[in-house]
Amino acid sequence: MGFWPKGYKSCFFLSFDYDASSAETWKTPDDLSSLSKGRYAPRVAVPRILDLLDRLEIKTTFFTPGWTCDNHRDSLIDIVSRGHEVAAHSYAHERMTELSAEKEAEVWERSIAALERVGVKPQGYRAPYWMFGERSINHMKRLGFKYSSNMMDEDIPYLLKHNGVDTGLVELPVEWLLDDWPHFEMDRMGPDEVYRLWKPEWEGLHELGRYFGLTCHPECIGRVSRLKMLERLVTEAKKGSDVWFPTGKELSDWASKKLK
C-alpha cells in the first residue's frame, strides 16, 4: 500500500515564498534598485503565477512574511480568494536563529498579527533561509501550528521529532536543489539548465512513489522564460492522473492521519 491518497502514486508539492521586498527593508534599505526587485512580485509575477495556477487547476501554498501582508494586502486577498493557502514565513524575512530569544518572540507575534489582518490563521511555517531552531519549534507548538517545511533529511513527509520527542508537527521536507533562488539568482543558470536539474529529480521521485517539494519565489520564477519552464515541468507531471498536487495544509493533514 502506498503512502498517498487512493489513486495517487506520488506527490508534487509546489510552493512559493512570497518575500517581495521584506528582506531588503533591513538588509539594503537605501538601495532603491534592490527594493524594486522585490516589488516585481506583487506588481507582475504574482498575478501571472495565479493565472498560471488557474489554468493548471492547482491550489498551492504561499509562505508569506508579515511585511508582505502589511504592504501588499490586495495581493494576499487575491491569493486567498483564489483558493490558495497562505502560511507563515517570519515578519521581514529575518534570520531567526541569529536573533535573541526576545527578538524572535517579537517576530513571531508580528508575523501572526499581520497574517490575521488578511484573514489568515497560519497552519504551516517555513523559516527564511531555512534557519530553523529549537525556539521556533517551541513557538510553533505554542501557537498551534500543524506543520513545518524546513528539514532536509527525507523525501517524504514525516512526524517531526526533536531530541527524540514528538513535536506534534508534520514535516514537509525541503532541499536546496529544488529551490529556484540559488540556480537563477546566484548561479545565473538559464531556464533550460534548471529544467535539466529538476526534471530527472521529479521523474525519479515519481517512479519511487515519493514527494517532490519545489520551492519558488515570485520575483525570481515569475520572469517570463522561467515561468514558461515551470509551466512545462508541471504540465508534464500532470499528464499522468496519479500525481497529487496538494496545498501544504492538505498534505500535512493527510500525513498526520496516515502516520499517527
Task: List each language-model region with its residue ranges.
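A conserved mid-domain beta-alpha-beta active-site/ligand-binding segment of alpha/beta enzyme cores
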Residues: 168-202, 206-208
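The substrate-binding groove and active-site-proximal loops of carbohydrate-active enzymes
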Residues: 33-40, 59, 63-66, 91-102, ...
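C-terminal domain-boundary segment and adjacent tail
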Residues: 6, 55-56, 147, 159, ...
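Conserved, mostly hydrophobic/aromatic
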Residues: 17, 53, 86-89, 125, ...
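Active-site beta->alpha N-cap acidic-glycine motif
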Residues: 1-82, 236
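Catalytic domains of cell-wall/extracellular-matrix polysaccharide-remodeling enzymes
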Residues: 71, 95-174, 221, 225-229
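Short, well-ordered coil/turn segments that N-cap beta-strands
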Residues: 8-12, 56-60, 81-85, 119-123, ...
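Generic structural signal for well-ordered alpha-helices
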Residues: 46-50, 73-77, 105-112, 137, ...
